[in-house]
Amino acid sequence: MTVTIKRAYDPASDADGFRVLVDRLWPRGVSKASAHLDSWPKDLAPSADLRTWWQHDPDRQGEFETRYRAELDGTPSAVAAVAELRAAIAANTKHGVRTTLIYGAKDPQVNHARLLAVYLAE
């Protein structure tokens, strides 16, 4: 399974392969034309309540991961979105195409896309 993450503000490239925006909200200042997205499954993003509580605070990262995993495992629409994305990743991998999770957060370490990539690989 070949999954990487990349900021929405970084230029798209052919090496990104299948580009999936995993934020609930569209990244500010990014045009839809320049985003070059193949998919935008909003149900993979943390809920508004969880995102508001977390605020990308590194001190809350551990608790955020626990709560985010609970949402991915327990919300029917998230479960369906995870299954659909895993199937797409498997098909892409079979054809030698990478899947890139696109996110808008500033920090490449403190963001839900990194956690989601790990979750999808399990």
List PLM regions with ranges:
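Residues lining hydrophobic/aromatic ligand-binding pockets adjacent to catalytic sites
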Residues: 1-122
